[in-house]
């Protein structure tokens, strides 16, 4: 396998490969660190991926880079088989100002906006398809393009009747749970959890693996509270630039529901309780 991969990459890079090292840690794509005489690059393979996943990632990285707000790996080359990215050496421990710097950078990213929510192409959230058809109404967009597709997949995967009853309550309340959401369509990373944040070897924040679209900035912020959360310094720095809006606690749960449903669909019924708890909090408020 490595000999064939080496040959294919040498043809794409048009230079001999000195080292080819597998990179662990990703749960979706196979990845390699590739060193030539001129550069070291990070290569993702299309093996095992759905069609269009690498292209969607490349487009998301391009969009984030356009904002100039936060560092992402530079896209060097995209082919049918490979996504070749800038290799960014990572530090083990973040410097003391890392989280506050990330908070400010995310707030600046969210200042980069367009008129309506959505994106010019569909993409993926993990391995799940993510619809991005633009609509002028954010609440409608989040229901039709975020919650409903995930819910329909969850039903197909056998989500229990107890969860269905809670979903029916949410349906009857909609769109009230997103009352007070921002009308500004901010540029969002889309999958901003701690596993998609790196510390470069010079201490700079780097974000990877985006699921980019434009929408309420709180959608990005809400995910940061799940799966371990971010440092308090991150939130303090973020809110110094973008103050927290009234009603965030309920909207936060709505935005988290999207990701919890996605985890149910990707990883199975161990996420049932988390989905039900989130639905319960939304519908009780």
What are these regions (language model features)?
Residues 65, 110-113, 242, 265, ...:
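Protein kinase-like catalytic domain
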Residues 263-285:
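ATP/Mg2+ or Mg2+-diphosphate-binding catalytic cores
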Residues 1-11, 114-187, 200, 281:
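An alpha-helical support segment within catalytic cores of ATP-dependent transferases
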Residues 254-263:
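Short helix/strand-capping connector loops at secondary-structure junctions
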Residues 48, 90, 148, 205, ...:
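Activation segment
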Residues 14-21:
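Conserved N-terminal boundary motif of the eukaryotic protein kinase catalytic domain
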Residues 131-143, 152, 181-187, 194, ...:
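Active-site Asp-x-Gly
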Residues 21-140:
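ATP-binding pocket architecture of kinase catalytic cores
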């Amino acid at each position: 396998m490595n000999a064939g991969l080496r040959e294919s990459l040498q043809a794409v890079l048009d230079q001999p490969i000195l080292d080819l090292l597998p990179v662990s840690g990703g749960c979706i794509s196979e990845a390699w660190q590739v060193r030539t005489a001129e550069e070291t690059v990070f290569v993702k393979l299309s093996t095992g991926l759905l069609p269009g996943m690498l292209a969607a990632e490349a487009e998301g990285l391009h969009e984030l880079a356009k904002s100039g707000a936060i560092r992402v790996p530079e896209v060097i080359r995209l082919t049918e088989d490979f996504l070749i990215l800038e290799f960014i050496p990572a530090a083990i421990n973040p410097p003391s100002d890392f989280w506050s710097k990330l908070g400010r950078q995310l707030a600046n990213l969210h200042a980069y906006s367009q008129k309506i929510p959505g994106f010019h192409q569909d993409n993926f959230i993990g391995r799940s398809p993510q619809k991005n058809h633009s609509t002028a109404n954010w609440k409608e967009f989040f229901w039709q393009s975020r919650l409903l597709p995930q819910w329909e997949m969850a039903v197909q995967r056998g989500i229990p009747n107890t969860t269905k009853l809670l979903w029916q309550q949410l349906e009857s309340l909609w769109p009230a749970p997103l009352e007070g959401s921002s009308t500004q369509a901010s540029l969002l990373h889309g999958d901003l959890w701690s596993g998609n944040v790196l510390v470069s070897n010079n201490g700079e924040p780097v974000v990877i693996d985006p699921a980019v679209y434009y929408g309420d900035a709180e959608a990005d912020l809400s995910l940061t509270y799940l799966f371990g959360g971010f440092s308090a310094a991150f939130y303090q720095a973020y809110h110094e630039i973008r103050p927290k809006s009234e009603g965030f606690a309920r909207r936060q749960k709505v935005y988290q529901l999207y990701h919890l449903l996605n985890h149910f669909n990707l990883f199975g019924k161990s996420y049932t309780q988390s989905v039900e708890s989130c639905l319960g909090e939304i519908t009780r408020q």
